Regions:
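Juxtamembrane/interface motifs at transmembrane-helix termini
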Residues: 26, 44, 109-110, 141-146
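"A position-specific structural signal for the A-helix of alpha-solenoid helical repeats
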Residues: 7-8, 41, 74, 105-111
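TPR/TPR-like alpha-solenoid repeats
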Residues: 12, 45, 78, 111, ...
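Intrinsically disordered, low-complexity, charge-biased linker/tail regions
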Residues: 36-41, 52-74, 123-197
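TPR/TPR-like (Sel1-like) alpha-helical repeat modules
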Residues: 17-37, 96-102, 113-137
Length: 197
């Protein structure tokens, strides 16, 4: 199942007023992939639905405790929007340990600020988010996009975007090519003298 194609098909159903068809398709794709974009569209499939309705709708496809991080983050986002801080915290609890990703840490900061107003704890989570591993995203040729695109804007390659954890840059400057191969004591080659006889 190709997630971007399924999302496009579901949006077409929604725009035609065929919400049931869209939700059926999204449920099937969610079970197969667990992709966060599918959960987000499923939650927003009914135009005009309240935040509480969106949270309830996600509860139809995601059980507690969430089976994986993407499910927990989707539930937490919907719960934060509905001001249901307890549900948001429960959804992220299995993923908010020492290996929390940037997305989980950012959501935890929102929960701390929204539920308790504790700026110190919120800043602590934001500081963790800066150092945390990145979440998967649509990437192509080193570019990160919020959503899948059919063509890479960098190279023009068709179907270049992949759902994966973006490559992080090393803080260390790489050595220029060829430098590592020379021993430290080796004399540098000199150019031949122009007037050598």
């Amino acid at each position: 199942d190709f997630v971007p194609a399924a999302l496009i098909a579901a949006r077409i159903h929604i725009n035609r007023g065929e919400t049931r068809k869209a939700m059926s398709l999204l449920r099937r794709i969610w079970r197969a992939t667990g992709h966060p974009d599918v959960a987000a569209l499923y939650a927003h499939a009914q135009p005009g639905a309240s935040a509480v309705d969106r949270l309830r709708r996600l509860g139809e496809i995601i059980e507690m405790p969430p089976p994986h991080r993407a499910a927990g983050m989707a539930l937490a986002r919907a719960a934060i929007d509905a001001y249901d801080w307890q549900s948001a915290r429960q959804a992220l609890a299995p993923f908010a340990g020492s290996d929390a990703t940037q997305g989980v840490a950012s959501l935890m900061a929102e929960i701390e600020e929204g539920e308790t107003g504790d700026q110190g704890k919120a800043r602590e989570w934001l500081a963790r988010a800066v150092r945390a591993p990145r979440d998967p995203a649509w990437t192509a040729d080193g570019l990160v996009s919020d959503e899948w695109e059919p063509v890479s804007p960098v190279t023009g390659k068709l179907d270049a975007f992949e759902w994966k954890v973006p490559v992080t840059l090393s803080a260390r400057n790489p050595e220029p090519p060829g430098v590592a191969q020379l021993p430290a004591e080796a004399p540098l080659p000199l150019a031949p003298a122009a007037n050598a006889t």
